[in-house]
A protein has these predicted regions:
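Fe-S ferredoxin-like electron-transfer domains
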Residues: 1-124, 137-149, 156
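Iron-sulfur-associated redox domains of electron-transfer enzymes in respiratory
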Residues: 1-17, 21-25, 38, 139-517
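Conserved glycine-bearing catalytic or ligand-binding loops at nucleotide- and phosphate-handling centers
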Residues: 130
Length: 517
């Protein structure tokens, strides 16, 4: 109505706000000091903002059992029924693992028939954890196990860090979003007590050698008229994405690349090649990864990534857990010097760094595949047409007269669109990159909370490409230590030994989703 004045801060309105928040708090556990979201809890901040110092409402509180999966803990007692997790799971990711059930006081967000997450369609992508404003959803914390391993004199403990971690870790220590803290991170890891500080980027370069060779083999056979070849090839670096297609597209398990993720390739190299170099048994080595991801915790526990029950990667920490570990060791992060990774498994190229952003894996593959396919030097290594933050993108790269059609999707809802188009026979791609999280690994569920401010993800995105541009080598096949690894150990990409250690297979999980009425 014209001339109406709306007072949003009258005593009546302020009291109404306080009453609503007090009612929420009256049915909320008061364990803030030990809660995983302490300091990052939106309910806690709202209570502080409204000056709530006392809860005037008493009564029965909801009680539910905890649901512990390999990656995610659901502490439903802390659920405030905001339903953000349900929204992101159903609308953004199109997974449908979570929904509101029951009515009134018994209402809660849960899986179908209140099954455990591992018995649901959950992909462990963890975007529900990022969306949750309170401590109802959190990652499985493994810092204690890592500290115990470091303290064991009989164990050689090595650590690998993913590319997206270095552009986000600084946020936990007051640095602006997009600050690159690679050197300080390496220094902090040494002071924590890791015996070797390596870089997952090394394994990303290795992934390109394997995945790129596989891609070129499929394309070459297709060009020669082999109609049985499976195209497009799909990337396989993201465990949330792998879980998604194993559960939802079991008829397409022969389409994705068989190359393991960089995390798992690194673990296989560490516990075989590097353990032999050190002259120790794989059982005496502990491999820890630092990832922007919670699904990596699940990935390293998969049976196919173990040898006689011993995992290639023992523990996977999120970026948030690494920040917690640094603080536990009372390390002044901002005062640390810049240090390098240890060699040889710490050497990497710019192509490996861009794995951290959506479109980065396919661009890294294009840099190497072009030179191998054409036999010519690629002068312009920046395929800017593959970059961006649009949910679904496509581009055509000219391989010296041969057009290579590429697709990119980030977010599982966008991945579903591309996979459905492949099923219908409408897709005209040679290769597709998929990442489960918005923005790729930079927007992973293990990164510092951005509370819906996507500009933070955009700044991390910019930082990834700055780091790439500053690298002296920017093509994976130019990494001298990768060449050395093949000369000394694997022989050639996609050879017998590399196929045994660096490749995997997939499973039909559509029947593993248990529904018990």
């Amino acid at each position: 109505m014209e001339g109406m004045v709306v007072n949003t801060h009258s005593l009546r309105v302020v009291n109404a706000r306080r009453t609503v928040v007090e009612l929420i708090l009256s049915d909320h556990p008061a364990d803030c000091l030990s809660c995983s979201k302490s300091g990052n809890c939106e309910l806690q901040k709202l209570a502080q903002k409204l000056g709530i110092r006392e809860i005037h409402f008493k009564g029965e509180q909801s009680t539910y059992r905890k649901d512990d999966s390999p990656s995610i803990i659901r502490d439903v007692d802390k659920c405030i029924m905001c339903r953000r997790c349900e929204t992101v799971c159903n609308q953004l990711q199109t997974v449908g693992a979570l929904s509101a059930i029951n009515r009134g006081f018994e209402a809660v967000v849960a899986t179908a028939f209140e099954q455990d997450l591992v018995k649901s369609p959950c992909t462990m992508c963890g975007q529900c954890v990022m969306a949750c404003p309170v401590g109802a959803l959190s990652e499985v914390n493994q810092t204690r196990q890592v500290i115990q391993a470091i303290s064991n004199p009989k164990k050689t403990v090595i650590v690998q860090t993913a590319p997206a971690v270095r552009v986000a870790l600084g946020e936990e220590f007051g640095y602006p979003a997009g600050t690159i803290v690679t050197g300080k991170m390496a220094a902090a890891l040494r002071r924590i007590g890791f015996d070797y500080v390596f870089d997952t980027d090394f394994a990303a370069d290795l992934t390109i050698m394997e995945e790129g060779t596989e891609l070129l083999d499929r394309i070459s056979r297709y060009v020669k008229g082999d109609k049985d070849v499976k195209l497009p090839i799909l990337t396989s670096c993201c465990p949330g994405w792998v879980n998604f297609f194993e559960t939802n597209y079991p008829d397409m398990l022969d389409v994705p690349s068989t190359a393991k993720s960089p995390q798992q390739m690194f673990g296989a190299v560490a516990k075989n090649y590097w353990a032999e170099k050190l002259g120790i048994k794989r059982e005496d080595m502990v491999v820890v990864s630092v990832m922007p991801c919670v699904a990596k915790k699940y990935e390293c526990q998969r049976d196919e990534f173990k040898t006689d029950g011993n995992p290639d990667v023992d523990y996977s920490l999120t970026t948030r857990e690494l920040a917690e570990l640094i603080k536990q060791f009372n390390i002044d992060f901002t005062s640390l010097p810049e240090e390098d990774f240890d060699m040889p498994l710490g050497a990497s190229t710019g192509a490996a760094v861009i794995f951290g952003a959506t479109g980065g894996v396919i661009e890294a593959a294009a840099r190497t595949a072009y030179e191998i396919f054409t036999g010519k030097t690629l002068d312009k290594v920046d395929f800017t047409e593959l970059r961006g933050l649009e949910g679904v993108r496509e581009a055509t790269i000219d391989f010296d007269g041969t057009p290579i059609h590429l697709g990119i999707a980030h977010g599982l809802g966008n991945a579903r669109k591309l996979l459905d188009s492949i099923r219908r026979g409408e897709a005209n791609y040679h290769a597709i990159e998929v990442m489960a999280c918005p923005g790729g690994c930079i927007g992973g569920a293990g990164q510092p909370y951005h509370h819906g401010d996507f500009s933070i993800v955009e700044k991390r995105h910019e930082a990834i490409y700055r780091e790439d541009a500053n690298k002296p080598l920017r093509k994976s096949h130019e990494n001298p230590y990768i060449k050395q690894l093949y000369d000394e150990y694997f022989g050639k990409p996609c050879g017998e030994k590399s196929h045994h250690l660096l490749h995997t297979h997939y499973f039909d999980k559509s029947k593993q989703v248990e529904v018990e009425a």
